[in-house]
């Protein structure tokens, strides 16, 4: 093993096994540790060992034992040692290390070093490693360089270092002098592109500090009046940035900054980003000094977007920054459409990085311009066929984001083509597509139910093995709720034709989704297929073939999947009242009896229960084993601020037999105990996989109150409920809150706004903690409220933590053209 860095790297790369590599690294690490302890080690060998230490750092090994030695190298007068020491310190230390205190004096000395490259090293390291204490101690030295240096190289480094220091310690804004920046910009001899980059960095740090301040706390605890002392002087630089950006975007390219025919794209991107921060802070603080330039900025962005070459990487970088700025500031609609067209050009290109960036950005801007994004559906569909899995995933997410009633059929057909081409390696993409397709049909009303069932038929056939039981449950609900019996019958006929004839090889044993849905449909609608006549496959679909198929599945899955066996038992019981041939009915009875002594307790219990059912008279069985009624899901109505659905479910145990027989349960309603609301699983209810029927809570008094409140609203406008609490009071309006429910992870509440004077164009903006998600309903009955009248808004909050709400209100008072702003916070006693 050689002693040089090169030989060490060669030995590590040449290791044939992981154990050999580990042995080489461990041995070399021990040697380095030993040699660094030697006070008499020559500088040259000490330098080599630090180089090896940095290589160990790159490999992810522990290097803490070399931190002090790195600092010692910085103190050397030899520039080579100093450079290596600063590099090692930058990599091996961070701002939390106590060793940083040892650096203070060394950095201070090097900041006054006669060699500008030594000063540059100190500035770079200080920017990387600065802690708030180090920033306060050494900022005056950095400021001195900014004030007095005429060297563009040092100025560039000093400005970027100052940007890091100011962002690290906000109190430095008190001593920061914006006139220094103005002087630099006005001096053509030192204001090179590198210095301009430094200027943009320091302004970005100052503006980001402003963004982090609350709007109603203009004068912070550090005593700085940000709007007047900082933003107003900074706004004087806006015109200069506009001129420089416009000049760079013109055809007058300086050869020294030409990148693929574009003038310094790095600086252009930084200036655009800086201007974006200007206007974000200006809007936050309502600064006219900044906002007066907004129209000019829109015009400039339009010229940049139009003139920049989108075929080159450098041009794409500028255009991407332009698009981000357009949507971050929510500029006018023509600019937003222009931005989306730029992203569509990126999609049409061949570079995968550009495609990914475009898809990711389009996904974020869909809520702002959904129609404009939908126009480029062709490019999005092409990305679904890309070889890069990350691009396919982003294209999938975007496809579902733009899906609506107008393009439902076209997009779903595209997604079905996508599923047909996937293999098992694309499992994540398949599962994502299936889940979102099922959710789409679950939440949207599709008029063509036959087409909808065809989609599910193809999903089950292509990728049924990837569908989890929860989504199978949703599919069965959708099938069950299909209104036309002929559509259900045709759906089952197609499934049976494939499973019973010679093409059954199309469906593998692993396709559990197909088998579960088919077994359930056989039990529910087997008589429909038989009664309507066998139009297609008349010799295949009959009572005997269906019975034999169930027996085949029983043999196939007895040892591997008890869930399917549960479904088979229920299907056999239901078919006993749908079949007429005694021989087949007896086979079904024997199938059920075969599990009366099963080692699985739940299966044994079910089999014995079903045997008792089986022996009942046909008239009793027909009533009990009727086809499932339409399944109603519990949903919330937030459209136009409507109250929760009146059909609240009782927390009494569900009497399944009484429910099937159509009898009303007369058990007294108990008060809610706050248990989690649990949705009824249609599969478990039918196939009896659990002994206990699901119970869900209900507050009878609250139901009566809600129903009464809804009736009052329908007849005479919104009125305050008795349990509403006042959470805000001002000279313009009162705000009340009524907490409808606050179960584990989910809360529903209504806000009531009572006007004291005429309020028009009321807009509400609500925020919750990061661990929670808020869904906001519309104002009902109107956003205009006369004096003493009330409007209502429904809120749904999900997540975890203490229930807290921040509400901001914008409105016009008494017909005034000016907008009144009010804001308040409220903490509820409940916890999600």
Swiss-Prot record:
Single GO term (MF): clathrin binding
Disulphide bridges: none
A biological process from GO: vesicle targeting, trans-Golgi to endosome
Boundaries of every GAE domain copy: 733-832
GO CC terms of this entry: AP-1 adaptor complex; cytosol; Golgi membrane
Localization terms from the record: Cytoplasm; Golgi apparatus membrane; Cytoplasmic vesicle, Clathrin-coated vesicle membrane
Domain of life the protein comes from: Eukaryota
Protein topology in the membrane: Peripheral membrane protein
Pfam families per the UniProt record, alphabetical: Adaptin_N (PF01602), Alpha_adaptinC2 (PF02883)
Keyword match Transferase: no
Keyword terms, alphabetized: Cytoplasm, Cytoplasmic vesicle, Golgi apparatus, Membrane, Protein transport, Transport
SMART domains per record: Alpha_adaptinC2 (SM00809)
Subunit note: Adapter protein complex 1 (AP-1) is a heterotetramer composed of two large adaptins (gamma-type subunit APL4 and beta-type subunit APL2), a medium adaptin (mu-type subunit APM1) and a small adaptin (sigma-type subunit APS1). AP-1 interacts with clathrin. Also a component of the AP-1R complex composed of at least APM2, APL4 and APS1.
Function: Adaptins are components of the adapter complexes which link clathrin to receptors in coated vesicles. Clathrin-associated protein complexes are believed to interact with the cytoplasmic tails of membrane proteins, leading to their selection and concentration. The AP-1 complex interacts directly with clathrin. Component of the AP-1-related (AP-1R) complex, an adapter protein complex that mediates sorting of cargo SNARE SNC1. In contrast to the APM1-containing AP-1 complex, AP-1R is incapable of sorting CHS3.
Further details from the record: Present with 4850 molecules/cell in log phase SD medium.
Protein name from the UniProt record: AP-1 complex subunit gamma-1
């Amino acid at each position: 093993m050689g002693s040089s860095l090169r030989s060490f790297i060669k030995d590590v790369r040449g290791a044939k096994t992981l154990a050999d590599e580990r042995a080489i690294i461990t041995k070399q690490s021990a040697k380095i540790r030993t040699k660094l302890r030697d006070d008499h080690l020559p500088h040259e060998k000490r330098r080599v060992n630090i180089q090896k230490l940095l290589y160990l750092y790159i490999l992810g090994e522990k290097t803490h034992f070399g931190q002090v030695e790195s600092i010692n190298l910085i103190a050397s007068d030899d520039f080579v040692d100093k450079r290596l020491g600063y590099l090692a310190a930058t990599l091996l230390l961070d701002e939390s290390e106590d060793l940083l205190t040892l650096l203070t004096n060394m950095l201070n000395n090097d900041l006054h070093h006669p060699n500008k490259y030594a000063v540059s090293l100190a500035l770079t390291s200080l920017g990387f490693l600065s802690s708030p204490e180090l920033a306060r101690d050494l900022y005056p030295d950095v400021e001195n360089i900014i004030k007095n240096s005429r060297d563009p190289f040092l100025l560039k480094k000093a400005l970027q270092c100052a940007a890091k220091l100011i962002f690290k310690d906000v109190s430095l804004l008190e001593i920061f002098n914006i006139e220094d920046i103005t002087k630099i910009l006005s001096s053509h001899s030192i204001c090179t592109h590198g210095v301009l980059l430094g200027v943009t960095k320091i302004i970005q740090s100052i503006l980001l500090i402003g963004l982090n301040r609350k709007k109603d706390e203009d004068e912070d605890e550090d005593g700085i009046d940000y709007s007047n002392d900082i933003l107003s002087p900074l706004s004087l630089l806006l015109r200069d940035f506009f001129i420089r950006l416009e000049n760079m975007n013109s055809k007058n390219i300086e050869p020294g900054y030409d990148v693929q025919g574009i003038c310094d794209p790095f600086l252009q991107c930084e200036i655009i980003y800086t201007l974006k921060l200007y206007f974000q802070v200006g809007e936050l603080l309502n600064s006219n000094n900044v906002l007066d330039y907004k129209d000019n900025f829109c015009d400039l962005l339009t010229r940049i977007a139009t003139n920049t070459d989108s075929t080159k990487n450098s041009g794409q970088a500028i255009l991407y920054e332009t698009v981000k700025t357009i949507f971050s500031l929510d500029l006018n609609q023509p600019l937003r459409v222009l931005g989306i067209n730029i992203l569509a050009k990126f999609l049409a290109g061949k570079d995968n990085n550009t495609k990914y960036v475009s898809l990711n950005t389009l996904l974020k801007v869909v809520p702002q311009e959904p129609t404009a994004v939908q126009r480029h559906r062709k490019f999005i569909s092409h990305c679904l066929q890309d070889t890069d899995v990350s691009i396919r995933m982003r294209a999938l997410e975007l496809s579902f984001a733009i899906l609506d009633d107008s393009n439902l059929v076209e997009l779903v057909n595209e997604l079905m083509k996508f599923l047909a081409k996937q293999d098992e390696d694309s499992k994540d993409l398949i599962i994502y597509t299936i889940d979102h397709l099922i959710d789409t049909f679950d939440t949207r009303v599709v008029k063509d139910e036959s087409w909808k069932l065809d989609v599910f038929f193809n999903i089950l056939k292509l990728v049924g093995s990837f569908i989890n039981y929860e989504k199978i449950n949703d599919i069965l609900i959708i099938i069950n709720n299909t209104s036309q019996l002929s559509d259900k019958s045709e759906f089952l006929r197609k499934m049976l034709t494939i499973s019973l004839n010679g093409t059954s090889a199309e469906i593998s044993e692993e396709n559990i989704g197909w088998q579960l849905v088919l077994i359930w449909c056989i039990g529910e609608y087997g008589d429909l297929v038989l009664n309507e006549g066998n139009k297609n496959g008349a010799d295949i679909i009959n009572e005997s073939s269906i019975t034999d198929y169930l027996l085949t599945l029983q043999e196939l899955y007895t040892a591997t999947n008890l869930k399917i066996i549960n479904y088979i038992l229920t299907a056999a019981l239901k078919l006993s009242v749908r079949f007429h041939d005694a021989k087949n009915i007896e086979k079904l009875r024997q199938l059920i009896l075969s599990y009366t002594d099963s080692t699985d307790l739940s299966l044994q219990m079910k089999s014995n229960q079903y045997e008792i059912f089986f022996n009942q008279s046909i008239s009793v069985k027909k009533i009990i084993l009727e086809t499932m009624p339409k399944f109603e899901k519990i949903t919330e109505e937030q459209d136009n601020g409507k109250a929760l659905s009146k059909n609240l479910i009782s927390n009494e145990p569900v009497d399944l037999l009484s429910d099937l027989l159509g009898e009303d349960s007369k058990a007294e309603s108990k008060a809610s105990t706050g248990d989690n609301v649990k949705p009824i699983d249609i599969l478990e209810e039918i196939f009896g996989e659990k002994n206990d029927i699901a119970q869900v809570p209900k507050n009878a008094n609250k139901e009566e109150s809600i129903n009464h409140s809804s009736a009052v609203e329908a007849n005479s406008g919104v009125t305050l409920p008795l349990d509403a609490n006042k959470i805000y009071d001002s000279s313009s309006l009162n705000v009340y809150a009524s907490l409808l429910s606050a179960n584990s992870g989910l809360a529903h509440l209504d806000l009531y706004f009572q006007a004291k004077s005429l309020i028009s164009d009321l807009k509400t903006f609500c925020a919750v903690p990061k661990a929670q998600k808020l869904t906001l309903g519309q104002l009902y009955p109107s956003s205009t409220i006369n004096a003493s009248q009330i409007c209502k808004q429904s809120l749904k909050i999900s997540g975890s933590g203490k229930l807290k709400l921040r509400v901001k209100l914008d409105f016009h008072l008494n017909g005034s053209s000016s907008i009144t702003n009010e804001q308040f916070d409220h903490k509820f006693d409940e916890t999600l």
